[in-house]
Amino acid sequence: INTVLSVDQDCSPELTAMFGSSLATSISKIPFNGPIAGVKVGLVDDKFIINPTPEQLENSKLDLTVAGTMDAINMVESSAKEVDEKTMLEALMFGHEAVKTLIKFQMEIIDEIGEEKMEYETLKIPRDLRKEVSTLATEKMDKALRIKDKLEKYNAIDELKEEIVNHYIVKNQDELSDDELKELEVKIKMILNDIEYKIFRGIVVKEHIRADGRKMDEIRPLSTAIDLLPRTHGSALFTRGETQSLSVTTLGALGEHQILDGLGLEDQKRFMLHYNFPQFSVGETGRYGAPGRREIGHGALGEKALLQVIPSEDEFPYTIRVVSEILESNGSSSQASICAGCMS
């Protein structure tokens, strides 16, 4: 648990919390593959800056957060004003070097006061059992994974897994106790998941075929429509494959901007993108409530993408709100939101 007690506007509480969480876990008995750390990277006057101040970020072409271990980067979040690939890669490497410095500092503390980690046993799967299940399932799993229709594919995989699990349960039910049968079921499912992963990865990496049978550079069927809603300022429908976003844009006076009063300096937004992901879009039922992490995260992603091409306040003195309603989803509804939002 991270509790913010005091905030220096030039030092991000999020990055401080990340550092503190890593250090607290690292010095404890809890097994942990850290330590980790994170930094922000800005780009002002073609020079990279670690943890830029709010004033520097205002003039920065790049707002990049990099987190990772001593050996690798494991999280990236960014918004930018059309930064090229070479610059982005350099920024990542620059940020990772700063991450390493923070981790070295943590290591000094860990070496001094860190506790010995708890030992634990993982579930061990006999080699003979893995080989036997692989022989039984590999060919059928390969066939199921090549089914192009998503629901049909999922049903075929589920039926195959259930068939093989039941085969082993029936085969061993007279010899094993209930607890042993449950453990065997877990082992069989783990083996089947490994087989599914390896076959699917092989299809993608070696054969360059995607989950629905498309080539790596092949795009799903696209369709668009605009001005579907007669009483709105702007509306657009974007469909790619089985993913569909209905985007509605509304204009308001500048005084209707959103006021942001959080831990940082009070700020305001004249452009907002809100993303809604109802349960029916993926064939499920569920209650409607406050936005979850998905809605907040996808909305922020789409907002960052469109914000860079929104006219300045001097050119277009209005508040702009875009709402993306996901009507169906089969991958990358955030991308659909950006396209529909741009058209609306």
What does each of the following model-derived ranges do?
Residues 1-14, 28-51, 242, 249, ...:
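Catalytic phosphate-handling regions of large nucleic-acid enzymes and associated NTPases
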Residues 6-11, 17, 112-135, 283-285, ...:
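Short, surface-exposed loop/turn segments at secondary-structure boundaries that line and modulate
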Residues 33-35, 102-120, 151-152, 174-188, ...:
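Flexible, glycine/charged-enriched surface loops at secondary-structure junctions
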Residues 121-267:
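Extended amphipathic alpha-helical scaffolds
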Residues 1-11, 70, 77, 228, ...:
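Glycine-rich, flexible beta-strand/loop modules in the N-terminal catalytic cores of phosphate-handling
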Residues 11-30, 225-249, 328-344:
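Conserved phosphate/anionic-ligand binding catalytic regions in large, soluble enzymes, centered on
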Residues 25, 29-148:
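Mobile "lid/hinge" segments at catalytic clefts and subdomain interfaces of large enzymes
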Residues 16-28, 91-94, 98, 102, ...:
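Stable alpha-helical structural segments in soluble proteins, enriched in small hydrophobic residues
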